[in-house]
Amino acid sequence: MYCDSFFMSRLLSLAQLSGSSWSSICLVCVTSLVFWRIKIAVTQYIRLRHIPSPSIFAAVSYIWLARTTYSGKQYWIHRDLHRQHGPLVRIGPNEITTDDPEILKKIASSGSTYSRGTWYLTGRFNPYHDNLFTILDPFAHKKAKTRSMPAYLGRDTPGLEVIINDKVKQLISILQRRYLAVLPGQDPPLVDLGLISNYFTMDVITHLAFGHQVGYLQDEKDHYNFLGSVRKLWPQMSTSADVPWIRNILFSRPVLRFLGPKHTDKKGFGALMGAAKQHVDRRFDSGEERKHDMLESLMKRGFTRQECEIEGLFLLLSGTESTACAIRQILVHVITAPSVYAKLKQEIDSTCQGRGISYPIQLAEAKRLPYLQAVIYEGIRMRPPLLGLFPKVVPEPGETFHGQFIPAGTSICTNGSSLLRSKSLFGADADLYNPGRFMELSKERREEMERNVELAFGHGQWMCAGKTIAFMELNKVVFEKHCQFFRAFDMQLHSPLKPCEVESYAGLIAKPPAKSSDLSMISRVTDMSRGINPCYRYPPQYRTHLKTHMLNVPSGSNFIRMPIVLPST
């Protein structure tokens, strides 16, 4: 303190000697600002200097973190951090990341006093109200979560699984009607399985949250250009979220009030906000019949119309791209592993032939299929759908992990990329895709491994509220796509050496193709029609004779081209 006062007095004396000109005043201000910033950097460096970091820039500034996030290689860089530097790694002046599941479980335990860091405020899009994601205080968050969880878990929403079933049926129907019904002489249509997965999750969430689907799947259209705008801005928004001084400005209430999305916008997230407002207002004003959906559950528990809008919109932001990403990653890993592909088809065949299975399959039925569960969990493990920092602030008087003291106020972040590739948790072959790792264990050990994978969705009081919905979507879509397509059609990769090009910005984003004509045809068609269970029916126009078609997708973004064979009956 004495040093600071002495330095400032010398600067003021210098300014007085030079005359009270504007240039002298500016010199004093700039020099003072530089000195103040250096002092803060040195102080921050000293308090965590015992924690290893990948770069000196990570210890004294946010240059390393911003560059890593903006590069689109966040997943791969963070995946290798702890193998190189140990269980605790410093990635910012006040940020430490860990892949230790015991630390993460302790932080999220019910009696924990850790609070969320201001990173979570990047989920704020309404300047006047917080949502479940942006409530930082653990006690306030617990109260809000207790109030809304019955809607997410299905306790108040018996129609939850019914809505998802309807969307799965619609997805399968669209793939059959639009991409298999090819008249003689016509070129086969193109299907973008990555994008259509986004449309599926968008319609599921909008129907669950607001009682009405927007029609992404039916129209195969990015309504309001919501998905396009999110993908376009993802690098900038993710980088802004990871740099405190930027996020504190961009996501502050005054800035959101003037520059944030509005209900009156014609496209982007604001336009979707307007559509959500219309549906919520209609439900509140007209007293529509009971629909047993999430909106009704929130209304029953005293949520105002604005709170219903906000929670529904946040569910839309958090539950669409993440679940679609998981669907894409599971599909591409199955297709690139012939042994997995064959075992999964064998389990589905025996399941359909051995006992009656609902259409679409019920979640309880899917959970009884051990290899299907192994495929889903291993797909999530290989490419976790959520890769944010999710920082929690160390409470007073500080904490000690792995013999290292962590001062109070430090943000401890989750490194899901490294956690799910941990060799101590998943075996020496953790870098390899192997669903069989779950099949070789005792029941207790398998359940423990599955719980470690589920850390991708958080834990304890900070667990993702939409986890149940996400697993319901994954089980149904993965089973039905394999049952309706993989059992009937042989699928080949468009580019075996690079089946799917993705970038990582707090999640794995499939890159769009460079140009619409960027594709090549596959001529080999394999007859897979024998042994198809008749309970999986095709529309009448497909039943007259065996037809073969090629189902193509653009290069790069969606990784699959499928030779199609329709079974005769």
Curated annotation (Swiss-Prot):
Induction (record text): Expression is induced during the early biotrophic stage of development. Expression is positively regulated by the ABA cluster-specific transcription regulator abl7.
This protein's record includes keyword Heme: yes
Cofactor: heme
Domain of life, source organism: Eukaryota
Gene3D superfamilies: Cytochrome P450
InterPro entries cross-referenced by the UniProt entry: Cyt_P450, Cyt_P450_sf, Cytochrome_P450_monoxygenase
EC number(s) on file: 1.-.-.-
UniProt function note: Cytochrome P450 monooxygenase; part of the gene cluster that mediates the biosynthesis of abscisic acid (ABA), a phytohormone that acts antagonistically toward salicylic acid (SA), jasmonic acid (JA) and ethylene (ETH) signaling, to impede plant defense responses. The first step of the pathway catalyzes the reaction from farnesyl diphosphate to alpha-ionylideneethane performed by the alpha-ionylideneethane synthase abl3 via a three-step reaction mechanism involving 2 neutral intermediates, beta-farnesene and allofarnesene.
Pfam family, one: p450
Name of the protein described by the UniProt record: Cytochrome P450 monooxygenase abl1
Pathway: Hormone biosynthesis
Top EC category: oxidoreductase
Key words, A-Z: Heme, Iron, Metal-binding, Monooxygenase, Oxidoreductase, Virulence
Disruption phenotype: Impairs the production of abscisic acid (ABA). Does not affect sporulation, pycnidiospore germination nor fungal growth rates in vitro, and does not alter the pathogenicity of L.maculans.
Residues annotated as binding heme: 464
Example GO molecular function: heme binding
Organism: Leptosphaeria maculans (strain JN3 / isolate v23.1.3 / race Av1-4-5-6-7-8)
Family under the similarity heading: Belongs to the cytochrome P450 family.
Record bears the keyword Oxidoreductase: yes
